[in-house]
Swiss-Prot record:
Record-linked Gene3D superfamilies: Survival protein SurE-like phosphatase/nucleotidase
Residues annotated for a divalent metal cation binding in this entry: D8, D9, S39, N92
Cofactor binding remark: Binds 1 divalent metal cation per subunit.
Keyword Translocase appears in the UniProt entry: no
Annotated protein name in UniProt: 5'-nucleotidase SurE
A GO term for molecular function: exopolyphosphatase activity
Gene that this sequence comes from: surE
Requisite cofactors: a divalent metal cation
SUPFAM superfamilies: SurE-like
Source species: Burkholderia mallei (strain ATCC 23344)
Membrane-spanning segments: none
Alphabetically ordered keywords of this record: Cytoplasm, Hydrolase, Metal-binding, Nucleotide-binding
Length: 253
């Protein structure tokens, strides 16, 4: 078995090292991660300049001076002779639930695997500062082992969020849907030394839909949340109304 491991916090992140150690007994692991922290990079590819790949003398991890998506893209199309059995991303320093998934570099690295026909799993710790990271890595390894032993049909993309709890206090796994957040806080305006305005992106909004069945509800209740994602963004319930709207517009023109 071969696993391609990446993240969005960078190749020096504790979450990457912990996940690597937890997965080593399960498969051959190739690590390719961003050189820098790329949180919030989403699915961006670097098209304006060439990329370079380096290797850490300390860990053997490969890293690229680009985004999480670049990392997986370069590994799959430029380094590996054969496809890995699984792409794994994480462990992220902070949750990726609800609307977070659209911005998340952690989820994006996993998504790039799906783009090339490789099943993928993204792992995140619900709260920052790496509390109970070893326990989270243990859970992640259990999920990966279960997937390798009992693969899901097709090419699944799983988004996993793990509460920051001791292993013994976790209540198990729960399959969930994405919740929803309130809009993020407004940007924070400041002034640079030249007197020019600069802006910091505000904090994420609080949970708007954290009802039972959502990732927010599961993790708040002490469960590991597993959400199957898909790349098709088509709003199928709007197809009929949009078709009628377009037909009316084209007929009037």
């Amino acid at each position: 078995m071969r696993i391609l491991l990446s993240n969005d916090d960078g190749y020096l992140a504790p979450g990457l090292a912990a996940l690597y150690e937890a997965l080593r007994p399960l498969a051959e692991i190739l690590v390719m991660a961003p050189e820098q922290n790329c949180s919030g990079a989403s699915n961006s590819l670097t098209l304006s300049r060439p990329l370079s790949v380096s290797r850490s003398a300390a860990t053997g991890f490969y890293y690229v001076n680009g985004t999480p998506t670049d990392s997986v893209h370069v590994a799959l199309t430029g380094m590996l002779d054969t496809k890995p059995d699984l792409v794994v991303s994480g462990i992220n320093n902070g949750q990726n639930m609800g609307d977070d998934t659209l911005y998340s570099g952690t989820v994006a690295a996993a998504t790039e695997g799906i783009m090339f026909g490789v099943p993928a799993i993204a792992f995140s710790l619900v709260h920052k500062e790496w509390a109970h990271l070893g326990d989270a890595a243990r859970v992640a390894a259990e999920i990966v082992r279960h997937y390798l032993d009992h693969p899901l049909p097709g090419q699944p993309l799983l988004n996993v969020n793990i509460p920051n709890l001791p292993y013994e206090e976790l209540k198990g796994w729960r399959v969930t849907r994405l919740g929803k957040r309130h809009p993020s806080q407004p940007v924070i305006r400041q002034t640079n030394p030249r007197g020019e305005p600069i802006y910091w992106i505000g904090a994420a909004g609080d949970a708007l839909d954290a009802s039972e069945g959502t990732d927010f509800h599961a993790t708040a209740s002490g469960y590991v949340s597993i959400t199957p994602l898909q790349l098709d963004l088509t709003h199928t319930q709007m197809l009929g109304a949009t078709r009628d709207w377009a037909r009316a517009g084209s007929g009037a023109s």
